[in-house]
């Protein structure tokens, strides 16, 4: 099974086959609007703008799993991301990243990598749909290690 075999509901509630992103490098991030790391939205948007024409897509999956820091509705989350951080990368419905009710996307991502321990954990998926790397919450979108891993994934 590949990441691209999965489907996830967009923030608007429509089912989105992740095969839409097949052939691209994907950065999956669990997000939250009321977290000390929430400013990473700006960095993720910059990363998306810098790399989207090279084959990277950033996917945001809001989650209320850590500290109840994403309590809003889908409409609240989308409005917050758009007005506060001018987010244009794809956002999905709020998910559980671990435990009971874990989303199929996160069940796949955590098969060979640790579950997120906090908001803004990042998984890098290669063009082949396999998870290539995982980065903790404090790894910022402009971190050299993350960008190097993205560059390497894009080169394959």
Whereabouts are the PLM-identified features?
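N-terminal "domain-start" segment that seeds a small globular fold
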Residues: 1-19, 39
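Conserved helix-turn-beta segment immediately C-terminal to the redox Cys motif
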Residues: 24-25, 34, 39-62, 82-85
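Short, thiol/selenol-centered motifs that function as redox-active sites or metal-ligating centers
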Residues: 32-44, 63-66, 70-71, 129, ...
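Alpha-helical elements of Rossmann-like donor-binding domains used by nucleotide-donor carbohydrate transfer enzymes
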Residues: 43-46, 76, 104, 108, ...
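Thiol-based oxidoreductase modules, predominantly thioredoxin-like and allied folds used
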Residues: 55-72, 88-99
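Short, internal strand/loop/helix patches
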Residues: 75-119
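Thiol-/selenol-based redox modules, centered on thioredoxin-like
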Residues: 107, 111-156
């Amino acid at each position: 099974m590949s990441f691209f075999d999965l489907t996830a509901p967009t923030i608007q509630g429509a089912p989105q086959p992740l095969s839409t992103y097949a052939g691209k490098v994907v950065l999956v991030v669990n997000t939250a609007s009321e977290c000390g790391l929430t400013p990473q939205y700006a960095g993720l948007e910059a990363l998306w703008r810098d790399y989207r024409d090279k084959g990277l897509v950033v996917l945001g999956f809001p989650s209320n799993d850590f500290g109840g820091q994403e309590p809003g509705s889908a409409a609240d989350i989308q409005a917050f991301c758009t007005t506060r951080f001018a987010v244009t990368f794809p956002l999905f419905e709020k998910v559980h990243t671990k435990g009971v009710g874990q989303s199929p996307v996160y069940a796949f991502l955590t098969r060979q990598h640790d579950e997120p321990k906090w908001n803004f954990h990042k998984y890098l998926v290669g063009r082949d749909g396999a998870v290539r790397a995982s980065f903790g919450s404090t790894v910022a979108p402009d971190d050299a290690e993350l960008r190097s891993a993205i560059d390497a994934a894009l080169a394959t």
